[in-house]
Amino acid sequence: MNNIFERSIGLLGEGNFNLIQQKVIAVFGLGGVGGTALEALARTGFKHFILVDFDKVDASNLNRQILYTQKDIGRNKVDAAKDRILSINPNCEIQTILAKAQDFDSNQPIDFIVDAIDDVDGKLFLLRLAQENNIPQIMSLGMANRFECEVVHVTKLNKTHSDPLAKKVRYLVKKSGLEVGNVNVVISEEIPQKNAEKLYSTMIVPSCAGLTIAKYILNSIIDNK
């Protein structure tokens, strides 16, 4: 199976490749951001995943969520996502949990938490889980109603601006007594379209955020070995 990852090994080096294969990545939210992050990590060589989502695949997801096709409409996202990743690398070990983030309960060790959910209560739960257990994390903030990839990047929650979701999360994190300065986030500096009545998007910006998350996780693990 290593022939699949010949080019990953060539770029990363065998030692780093073996390191990432040992890590357990928990992905909360398997939509436009989380789905792309998951697939990028799996194609890079990560093989241990915990997938958490309560939702089903809807036809409206197909314009931007890389994990799903027409045959997946109506399926639980966690099941469709697992099948997708196993079709790429059958050696992956994947635990699926059909639940909201705040209902997550697992004793399995986690090496990195990906927060790609929209629910603020869930975000606070995941942040508390990360801080209380010293688990590295990255949180996705608002990516809808935007067009530009060039302004998507990783920063700290207390350095964010121009993002209504970030403002709300920042306030609630402080109110909850959690540490705001150490919260890693992927954010778009683009001001969202004000004329949008709903959360609209194409694949471009959410997937850019997902790829940015995958890059951040890869670099963090290799740099801190």
Where would I find each of the regions flagged by the language model?
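Conserved SAM/SAH-binding loop
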Residues: 97-104
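N-terminal charged helix/coil linker that caps or initiates catalytic domains
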Residues: 1-25
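Hydrophobic/small residue at the entry helix of a nucleotide-binding pocket
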Residues: 33-34
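Glycine-rich phosphate/adenylate-binding loop
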Residues: 108-112, 117-125, 132-133, 137, ...
